[in-house]
């Protein structure tokens, strides 16, 4: 912000009024920058290797979910290690009881989205399947979706993203909830 514009503001923001030397070497700041760019990796017995993405405040990794590799994202405050622990603990609770959560998420998505899947099927001119005589059932819907990613927050909220098996022409099926309240939402994403 230019100095002449900032002078009339009640709260004056920082502004650069002059650059004395461009590209000045500063060993102290260089050391801070190098430390910032060092990778932060956590090894967890349940969740495996998790790497901090400082740009997005997430730890990223892969887990086994019902026999399949699934991406895991832990939403954290990169500057707050307690948030790392809370997010890891929440994710471990999901993973430890994954069969129960997987069935509940699939059933919830099927209950809430099967009608919409049949609506999309009726609009698919290339499909030989008639939703009037051979509709997608809730059981079929639940079996067809494939979990690809789980995102977990420190507070125990989670969102699971499923491949739609082209029932929605490539959109993801998104299922959200929390460890305390259970599954609360299912919709399309992407």
Q: Over which residues does each language-model region extend?
A:
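Broad gene-expression machinery/nucleic-acid interaction feature
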Residues: 6, 10-14, 58-60, 69-71, ...
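OB-fold/S1-family single-stranded nucleic acid-binding modules
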Residues: 2-35
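Beta-strand elements of well-folded, non-transmembrane domains
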Residues: 3, 67, 78, 164-166, ...
């Amino acid at each position: 912000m230019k100095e002449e514009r900032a002078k009339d503001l009640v709260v004056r923001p920082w502004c650069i009024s002059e650059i004395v030397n461009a590209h000045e070497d500063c060993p102290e700041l260089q050391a801070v920058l190098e430390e910032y760019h060092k990778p932060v990796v956590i090894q967890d017995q349940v969740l495996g290797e998790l790497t901090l993405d400082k740009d997005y405040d997430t730890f990223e990794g892969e887990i086994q979910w019902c026999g399949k590799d699934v991406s895991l994202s832990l939403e954290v405050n990169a500057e707050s290690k307690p948030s790392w622990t809370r997010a890891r603990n929440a994710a471990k609770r999901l993973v430890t009881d994954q069969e129960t959560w997987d069935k509940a998420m699939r059933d919830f998505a099927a209950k809430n989205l099967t009608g919409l899947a049949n609506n999309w099927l009726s609009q698919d001119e290339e499909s030989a399947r008639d939703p009037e005589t051979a509709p997608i059932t809730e059981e079929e819907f639940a079996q067809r979706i494939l979990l690809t990613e789980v995102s977990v927050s420190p507070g125990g909220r989670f969102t699971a993203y499923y491949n739609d098996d082209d029932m929605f022409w490539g959109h993801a099926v998104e299922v959200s909830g929390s460890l305390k309240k259970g599954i609360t939402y299912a919709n399309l994403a992407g």
